[in-house]
A protein has these predicted regions:
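S-adenosyl-L-methionine
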Residues: 1-22, 37, 57-85
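Class I S-adenosyl-L-methionine
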Residues: 2-10, 99-220
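Conserved class I S-adenosyl-L-methionine
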Residues: 22-31
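Conserved SAM-binding loop of SAM-dependent methyltransferases across substrates and taxa
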Residues: 32-44
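Conserved SAM/SAH-binding beta-strand->alpha-helix loop
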Residues: 52-54
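Short SAM/SAH-binding signature in class I
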Residues: 88-95
Length: 220
């Protein structure tokens, strides 16, 4: 039977590019299952998780249509909770907030092991994600800025080293993306968000800890 790999947008394609050949992959918040199906067709074993049952059914249909349902294990649950330590080498989280990504990582202590690769694309607050990864002993290995649906996103590739550090504001803002395609647009977008965030801080409207940007009074 002829199979057809699902089309991936720029964000998911960049995530897929960081997955190691033949890896055991956890696709957290797998949603429609397109990334899981594509990776399975490329030779990976995939565990897809989602906190809601409906997206898992959509993912199941996607994988069946692609002819790879036998290589994708879909599990209902929050974040990495449905997995046991040792079941995944590469962990993908895309389309969720930085705070949610950090919550998921904090709840799964087994991810703090050398050799596990994190592939992360936060929907919001990438500077916060960079900072908190460094504080938790993870090191950024590479980044890819992409444009999807008219917005610039950055896909981070990171691994655990155990060396906790406090990155400076410049690193939090641009990370390893300074010389990459779309870097200029990324800087412009980041500068605009920084300006708005500083204005919110000055007005006392910043309600979320860590919700500011480097240089803001609330950046803690």
């Amino acid at each position: 039977m002829e199979t057809k790999a699902p089309h991936l947008d720029a964000r998911l394609a960049a995530c897929a590019a960081y997955v190691r050949p033949g890896a055991r992959v956890a696709d957290v918040g797998c949603d429609h299952g397109k990334l899981a199906a594509r990776l399975a067709l490329e030779g990976c074993r995939v565990i897809g998780t989602d906190i809601h049952a409906a997206p898992l059914e959509t993912a199941r249909a996607t994988c069946a249509a692609a002819g790879c349902a036998d290589r994708v294990d879909l599990r209902l649950g929050d974040g990495l909770a449905p997995l046991e330590a040792g079941e995944a080498d590469d962990i993908v989280m895309a389309g969720i907030s930085a705070e949610t990504i950090l919550h998921i990582l904090d709840a799964a202590g087994w991810v703090r092991r050398k050799g596990i690769r994190l592939i992360l694309c936060a929907a919001t607050k990438t500077p916060l994600l960079r900072r908190e990864l460094c504080r938790r002993g993870f090191a950024l290995e590479d980044e890819t800025p992409v444009v999807a649906a008219g917005r610039v996103y950055t896909v981070l590739c990171a691994g655990y080293t155990g060396e906790e550090r406090e990155p400076d504001g410049e690193f939090c803002l641009v990370g390893l993306s300074a010389a990459k395609p779309h870097a200029a647009r990324l800087r412009d977008d980041t500068a605009a968000k920084l300006k708005n965030s500083c204005a919110d801080c000055a007005a006392g409207n910043n309600r979320k800890p860590g919700g500011c940007w480097p240089g803001c009074a609330g950046w803690n």
